[in-house]
Design a protein with these regions (language model features):
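A structural alpha-helix within SAM-dependent methyltransferase catalytic domains
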Residues: 45, 134-135, 183, 203, ...
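Arginine residue identity/basic-tract feature
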Residues: 5, 12-18, 46, 84, ...
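Extended alpha-helical interface modules used as scaffolds for assembling large macromolecular complexes
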Residues: 1-22, 117, 121, 125, ...
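Short, well-ordered alpha-helical scaffold segments within catalytic/effector domains
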Residues: 34-45, 158-162, 196-200
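Walker A/P-loop-proximal flanking segment of P-loop NTPase domains
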Residues: 1-64, 71, 77
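Sensor-1/coupling segment of RecA-like P-loop NTPase cores
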Residues: 199-213
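P-loop NTPase nucleotide-binding core
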Residues: 53-55, 59-198, 211
Length: 213
């Protein structure tokens, strides 16, 4: 018996995952929850609940599934019940129990999903932020306010995020900020003599605010 009669690969699983555009209930159908994904997610859950650490880096070679794991986390914390239910179907009972014990969920998390590239990461991050405010039903009013803000620098972005996250505290369970292709963002900042410590500064700010991030 050939393997083709036992397995099939969905077209969406034959290309790289885009965390900014691939999220849907259909994305999770047929997704394999392998040991690496389980270990990465459960380590994150434990660290978050036990230490209160807010910033994490998921590393690995190209094609190892980093973006897919990030999008799975996105689904698990998403406001949309259909998306979240589809993501929960992917993980096993051990991971589900650990998720319930480690992460507060009732309103859904505001989710900023940014992918680095050839553009200024400040603009990419801010565009992703405005899209996130529109995506969550409780933060649309904040979008009306913050869409008028013109972000001028890395430090201005962090200051504005701090203000925004504090305002969103009562509206959402927390803020999930995902920066995919971080190397490309750092390369752009370096070439244009920007602030290479952007992510370090961001991590420090996240540790000071009350909103879970």
């Amino acid at each position: 018996m050939t393997l083709i009669k036992q397995y099939s690969i969905a077209t969406r699983q034959q290309r790289s995952t885009r965390i900014d555009s691939d999220l849907s209930p259909e994305f999770f159908q047929g997704l394999v929850y392998h040991g690496t994904a389980q270990s990465a997610l459960e380590t994150l859950f434990r660290q978050y609940s036990q230490t209160g650490q807010s910033a994490y880096t998921l590393t690995g070679p190209y094609g190892s599934g980093k973006s897919t794991i990030a999008l799975l986390l996105t689904g698990l914390l998403h406001e949309d019940a259909e998306v979240r239910d589809a993501a929960i179907e992917v993980i096993n009972s051990e991971s589900k129990d650990l998720l319930d014990q480690s992460v507060v969920y009732s309103k859904g998390w505001l989710q900023i999903r940014s992918v680095g590239g050839v553009n200024n990461p400040v603009n990419t991050f801010w565009d992703a932020t405005l899209e996130a405010l529109l995506e969550h039903s409780a933060t649309k009013q904040l979008h009306s306010k913050y869409s008028k803000v013109e972000i001028k620098s890395e430090s201005h972005l962090i200051e504005t995020w701090e203000s925004l996250f504090n305002e969103a505290n009562s509206l959402v369970d927390g803020v999930l900020l995902l920066a995919d292709e971080m190397g490309k963002s750092l390369e752009f900042i370096n070439k244009n003599r920007g602030e290479l410590h952007l992510f370090q500064d961001l991590a420090e700010v996240l540790g000071r605010i009350d909103t879970p991030v």
